[in-house]
Amino acid sequence: MARTKQTARKSTGGKAPRKQLASKAARKSAPSTGGVKKPHRYKPGTVALREIRRFQKSTELLIRKLPFQRLVREIAQDFKTDLRFQSSAIGALQEAVEAYLVGLFEDTNLCAIHAKRVTIQKKDIQLARRLRGERS
């Protein structure tokens, strides 16, 4: 069916306003709950996408320095006691660890997408590590 062009028409008074039902009128006239405004919430996934863009732009380390340092010292205790670390050595370890984790999560995401999912799961990480040859 062909579309027709609509033209503006002059109003001739129109209809009288309809009467509201009793329940609607009661709902509108009821006092509000103190005017408390609900906090704004973004749709699910919006904040996650914003964080992804923010972290992909940034170059700073994402793991906090002191907790990482404590973890390194704790693991090193198992091999030899009274080990000392230069701050640059801890920094180099942290750079390497974060680069490894970012790469692993990229591969994990590809595994999830291959399975037609958007959420990564434990089995995706296991598959990514298996394909890399890290885990038999």
Swiss-Prot record:
Pfam families: Histone. One of its GO terms (cellular component) is nucleosome. The modification N6,N6,N6-trimethyllysine is found at residues 5, 28, 37, 80. Keywords: Acetylation, Chromosome, DNA-binding, Methylation, Nucleosome core, Nucleus, Phosphoprotein. The modification N6-methyllysine is found at residues 5, 10, 19, 24, 28, 37, 80. PANTHER family: HISTONE H3. Belongs to the histone H3 family. The nucleosome is a histone octamer containing two molecules each of H2A, H2B, H3 and H4 assembled in one H3-H4 heterotetramer and two H2A-H2B heterodimers. The octamer wraps approximately 147 bp of DNA. This is Histone H3.1/H3.2.
